[in-house]
């Protein structure tokens, strides 16, 4: 076992020695000649100085123009041939300073352009152009780089002064242009005032004069009309229209007299007719005939049994005779005659069809019509699918079933129209195969145009109507909350009092216990709220009736009544109504055209088949000739069928006793009724007595009324004449009033037009005033702080003469000229190797002696945990001591300034403790694998150092843990970044490493983990 342990120790020692030798060789080759490079750069003149430019400037706006002075500074340096400039990021520049790729880093700060354009500031802030030189340079090289920075800064200050002067001149030119624009606008306003208002107002009095003349004329006609009407009324005698009510009108008398005579005559005639009919009716003959018929029925009933056989014999003889006649008939057409007729008829029809010019013209016309119909049908299908620019509304969207359902159709309708869309796509593909690429057609892409058509809501709006009756004893306030997506027009009536539909609170009359609420208005969708409205497609209007705060009843615990009258209109249907109807109409039209297209498709233009037609006609004629024999056989079969059914038919006729009995009973009843009628006719009717003297009273009444009616007629004629004269005067008055109305309408239209013009002119003048005010405001800012009272502003003058100052980003290192400074890379590498050796010592001791137990486990079950804590403390303390020693040595070697030494030593101690704790845990827990991980981290660091070029940092530098430690010390030594967060992270890592070493799991069997 001991021999095996020594073999492991020897292998690890060899690996560490090889790593140290490789590191020393690498560092020597990479950093050994750094001082030589510094001295050599002095002798190679200024063009050997590499300057990294870091542009962090953000653009700004001045006088409406975009200003980027950082880019201008870089372009200025691009023309400089004495030095080598490169524009890089800050990380690349710092890496270049670190490895000698750059001698100077110039940083253009973020607010460079903003601070440089402080021409209007009273006390402008200084602009600093930051720079940093590489660590470890010779004093002569450092002085040369300072000179380079100063020269670059002086040149750029000169350019800035030129920019300031140019800006001032541009402001003056802009002021000159704006003054000219102001004069042009004023001239335009004066011209509009003369044309729009002054001239129309001068013509305005003429309209009033015409209206006055027409009004005076109408007034005269009205006065004349009333005078004539009054005169007619005064001249009329009221007694004339009084009629003696004791008499009826003559027309009633005449009608009554005539009606009396007519009824009297009709009565006489009816009596005469009755008497004549009585004498002419021969009831005895009818009765005797019916009795004779009754006796015949009795005789027929008795003879049924004896005559049945005779009927059967007679029917059979007739059928046999008919059968013999039909059988004797023969066909007039022989077989040879039929064939000859077939041949002759065929030749005749062929000649007729071949030489018939009208038939050929008809066939050609049909062919041309079919071709023209197919062409028109294809054009119609093309127009149904394709959307023409601007005007076309009959086109087809590429809609799916879900699109139709979203537009408001049910599933059956959606399936129907989806099938039509598929037909349109099928026809589109067929059409494109036949046409060149330039004539291809496509369905219009669908983007919810049908389901989201808000034009009707924007233009027409939606009606808002509601009627409600609210009863409450404590309601005294109405709160109206409108939908922010809509503009509301209309009013809310509460017990007849109107309020506008808008967001407001209204105090109600508390004397009322019942409120009748009527809402009537229109809500129009706002154009800018269309997108938000389409999320729920609902319009809301809330009317909340409640009670305002009652300060006089603070202890009243009675619940307050609240009535919520909310109107929610789901407008989903309004979004698709017009557009959906249009789309469905287009689809139905295409479907009809496509069905006609599929019916006509595939019909080839074949020649007319004359032979088939001739054969069909000849066969029809020949079949009729040959069917004689078949018809004869059919007739014989019918005769046989009649003979078979003859017995049944005779039996049905002769055995109908029930019907015979019923007829006999009906005849007996009819004979009895006629006997009763005969007795009635034998009696003489009594004639009615009529008093014809009553007619004289009606004649007397008519003669008395004639005089009264005549007198009324004369007065009516006079009144009619007066009325006609009044009508003519009224027509004249109506014409004059119409003319007055026209003049008033003209006045109204002219006044309205003048109002519109005045508003336009007012808006134009307001816009001009706004533009002038803006110009004055902006021009006032130009160099407003150029003077401090009556004196020149010295601060602004000093800023404009030398705006940009240089600022050296000081390093933590005390650079003492010709003294070389150790690199942080070598420093980090030495700390890591020292931690690896320390970790291996702890690991070897534990393998040889076992786990360190400062407290025996026998006394308490918790002593094992305390031993782990003490072990972790020993490891951490070792790292702390090593970090303190290394930090003191590095502090002197780096020549760290006095104010930064404590933080530097703290960083080194924490870093060393992290290295020792983590590496010790890896070796104690995973042994060989831990050693592999430690060496892998070291290898990544070597690769990262080799890739640390001026062009940028590679991927290995980002994944290498030691590279982050290296950057941490480099940034601190160059005073670039604060270290507060760094110290917190290191402290957390120390705690994690301490805890990990407390919980080491020892395996019973030795193995390679």
Swiss-Prot record:
Region (Disordered), start-end ranges: 680-707
Subunit and interaction comment: Homodimer. Interacts with EssB.
Compositional bias segments (type: Basic and acidic residues): 680-697
Inactivation phenotype: Deletion abrogates the secretion of EsxA and EsxC into the extracellular medium.
Membrane topology reported for the UniProt record: Multi-pass membrane protein
Database matches in InterPro entries: T7SS_ABC-Transporter (IPR051328), T7SS_EsaA (IPR023838)
Record has Coiled coil as a keyword: yes
Record's GO cellular component terms: plasma membrane
Gene3D superfamilies recorded: abc type-2 transporter like domain
Keywords: Cell membrane, Coiled coil, Membrane, Transmembrane, Transmembrane helix, Virulence
Organism of provenance: Staphylococcus aureus (strain USA300)
Function: Component of the type VII secretion system (Ess). Provides together with EssB and other components such as EssC and EssE a secretion plateform accross the cytoplasmic membrane in the host.
Protein encoded by which gene: esaA
Membrane-spanning ranges: 7-27, 822-842, 869-889, 903-923, 928-948, 979-999
Claim: Cell membrane is one of the keywords in the record: yes
Family: Belongs to the EsaA family.
Name the record gives this protein: Type VII secretion system accessory factor EsaA
Intracellular or extracellular location(s): Cell membrane
């Amino acid at each position: 076992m001991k021999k095996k342990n020594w073999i492991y120790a020897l292998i690890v020692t060899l690996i560490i020695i090889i790593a140290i030798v490789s590191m020393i060789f690498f560092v020597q080759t990479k950093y050994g000649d750094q001082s030589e490079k510094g001295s050599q750069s002095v002798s190679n003149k200024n063009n050997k100085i590499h300057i990294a430019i870091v542009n962090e400037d953000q653009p700004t706006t001045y006088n409406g123009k975009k200003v980027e002075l950082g880019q201008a500074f870089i372009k200025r340096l691009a023309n400089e041939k004495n030095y080598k400039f490169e524009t890089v990021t800050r990380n690349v520049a710092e890496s270049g300073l670190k490895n000698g790729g750059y001698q100077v880093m110039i940083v253009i700060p973020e607010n460079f352009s903003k601070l440089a354009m402080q021409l209007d500031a009273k006390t402008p802030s200084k602009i600093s152009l930051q720079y940093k030189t590489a660590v470890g340079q010779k004093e002569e090289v450092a002085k040369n780089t300072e000179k380079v920075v100063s020269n670059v800064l002086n040149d750029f200050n000169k350019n800035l002064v030129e920019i300031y002067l140019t800006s001032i001149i541009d402001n003056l030119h802009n002021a000159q242009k704006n003054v000219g624009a102001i004069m042009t606008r004023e001239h335009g306003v004066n011209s509009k005032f003369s044309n729009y208002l002054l001239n129309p107002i001068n013509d305005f009095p003429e309209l009033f004069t015409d209206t006055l003349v027409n009004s005076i004329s109408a007034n005269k006609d009205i006065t004349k009309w009333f005078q004539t009407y009054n005169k007619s009324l005064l001249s009329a005698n009221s007694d004339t229209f009084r009629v003696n009510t004791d008499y009826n009108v003559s027309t009633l008398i005449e009608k009554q007299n005539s009606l009396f005579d007519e009824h009297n005559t009709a009565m006489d005639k009816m009596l005469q007719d009755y008497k004549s009919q009585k004498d002419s009716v021969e009831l005895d003959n009818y009765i005797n005939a019916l009795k004779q018929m009754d006796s015949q029925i009795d005789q027929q009933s008795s003879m049924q049994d004896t005559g049945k056989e005779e009927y059967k014999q007679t029917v059979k003889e007739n059928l046999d005779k008919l059968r013999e006649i039909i059988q004797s008939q023969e066909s007039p057409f022989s077989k040879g005659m039929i064939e000859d007729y077939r041949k002759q008829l065929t030749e005749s029809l062929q000649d007729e069809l071949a030489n018939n010019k009208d038939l050929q013209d008809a066939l050609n016309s049909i062919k041309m019509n079919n071709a023209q119909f197919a062409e028109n049908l294809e054009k119609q299908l093309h127009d149904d699918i394709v959307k023409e620019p601007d005007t076309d509304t009959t086109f087809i969207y590429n809609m799916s079933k879900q699109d139709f359902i979203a537009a408001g159709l049910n599933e059956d309708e959606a399936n129907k129209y989806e099938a039509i869309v598929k037909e349109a796509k099928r026809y589109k593909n067929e059409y494109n195969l036949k046409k060149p690429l330039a004539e291809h057609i496509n369905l219009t892409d669908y983007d919810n145009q049908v389901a989201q058509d808000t034009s009707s809501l924007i233009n027409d709006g939606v009606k808002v109507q509601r009627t409600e009756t609210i009863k409450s004893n404590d309601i005294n306030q109405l709160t109206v909350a409108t939908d922010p997506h809509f503009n509301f027009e209309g009013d809310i009536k509460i017990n007849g009092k109107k309020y506008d539909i808008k967001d407001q609170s209204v105090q109600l009359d508390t004397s009322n216990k019942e409120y009748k609420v009527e809402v009537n208005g229109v809500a129009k969708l706002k154009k800018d709220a269309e997108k938000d409205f389409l999320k729920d497609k609902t319009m809301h209007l809330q009317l909340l009736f409640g009670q305002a705060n009652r300060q006089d009843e603070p202890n009243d615990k009675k619940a307050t009544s609240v009535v919520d009258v909310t109107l929610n209109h789901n407008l989903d249907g309004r979004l698709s109504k017009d557009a959906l109807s249009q789309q469905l109409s287009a689809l139905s039209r295409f479907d009809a055209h496509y069905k006609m297209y599929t019916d006509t498709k595939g019909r080839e233009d074949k020649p007319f088949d004359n032979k088939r037609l001739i054969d069909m006609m000849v066969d029809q004629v020949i079949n009729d000739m040959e069917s004689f024999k078949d018809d004869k056989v059919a007739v014989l079969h019918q005769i046989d069928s009649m003979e078979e059914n003859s017995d049944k038919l005779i039996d049905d006729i002769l055995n109908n006793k029930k019907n015979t009995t019923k007829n006999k009973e009906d005849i007996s009843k009819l004979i009895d009724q006629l006997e009763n009628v005969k007795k009635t006719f034998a009696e003489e009717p009594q004639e009615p007595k009529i008093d014809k003297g009553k007619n004289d009273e009606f004649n007397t009444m008519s003669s008395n009324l004639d005089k009264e009616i005549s007198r009324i007629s004369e007065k009516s004629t006079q009144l009619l004449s007066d009325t006609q004269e009044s009508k003519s005067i009224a027509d004249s008055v109506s014409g004059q009033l119409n003319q007055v109305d026209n003049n008033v309408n003209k006045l109204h239209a002219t006044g309205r037009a003048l109002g519109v013009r005045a508003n336009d002119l007012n808006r134009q003048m307001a816009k001009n005033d706004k533009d002038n005010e803006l110009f004055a405001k902006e021009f006032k800012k130009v160099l407003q702080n150029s003077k401090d009272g009556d004196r020149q502003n010295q601060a602004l003058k000093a800023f404009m003469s030398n705006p940009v100052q240089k600022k050296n980003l000081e390093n933590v290192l005390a650079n003492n000229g010709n003294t070389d400074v150790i690199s942080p890379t070598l420093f980090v590498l030495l700390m890591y190797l020292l931690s690896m050796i320390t970790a291996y010592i702890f690991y070897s001791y534990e393998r040889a002696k076992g786990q360190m137990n400062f407290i025996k486990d026998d006394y308490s079950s918790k002593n094992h945990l305390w031993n782990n804590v003490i072990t972790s403390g020993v490891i951490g303390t070792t790292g702390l001591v090593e970090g303190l020693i290394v930090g003191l040595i590095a502090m002197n070697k780096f020549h760290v300034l006095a104010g930064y030494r404590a933080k530097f030593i703290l960083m080194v101690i924490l870093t060393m403790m992290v290295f020792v704790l983590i590496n010790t845990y890896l070796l104690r827990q995973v042994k060989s694998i831990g050693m592999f991980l430690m060496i892998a981290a070291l290898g990544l660091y070597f690769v990262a150092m080799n890739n640390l070029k001026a062009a940028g940092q590679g991927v290995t530098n980002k994944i290498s843990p030691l590279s982050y430690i290296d950057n941490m010390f480099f940034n601190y030594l160059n005073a670039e970044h604060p270290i507060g967060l760094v110290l917190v992270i290191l402290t957390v890592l120390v705690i994690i490493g301490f805890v990990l070493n407390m919980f080491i799991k020892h395996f019973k069997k030795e193995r390679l983990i």
